[in-house]
Amino acid sequence: MEYQFTHSIHGVVAKCSMDHEAFARWLNAEITENPSQLAPIFAEIEKCRAAFPNHYECVFEGREYSLYFDYDEVMAKANNLDAAFDDEEMEEGFQFYNEESIAFCGLDDFEKFLKAYQHFVQTYH
């Protein structure tokens, strides 16, 4: 997973590589206004590691995006993704685009992403 942090007039903005955009959107929507929310997420990462190889799941539900943890993977998913969507309403040849609404990565990669964000905020903000 590749990522980049920048400053804007709204504060720190995260961007992620394709297939991981939902993690940046989650961070920008749920964490940038309240970085103290990272502490319970780091604690959850440790619980996931401690549970390995047993099955373990946890959900952090946010306003716009939620995180789903298991013992080795994290999923960021837009809360509105499960909204009813009628394929019949779409014109022929079109399909629903949800690449920015859901993403998966390993637990270690997610932890590195969050630590890099923390470092950027502490160093440059």
Swiss-Prot record:
InterPro entries in alphabetical order: UPF0231
Top-level taxon: Bacteria
Matching NCBIfam families: PRK05248.1-2
Family of this protein: Belongs to the UPF0231 family.
Protein name as annotated: UPF0231 protein in hemN 3'region
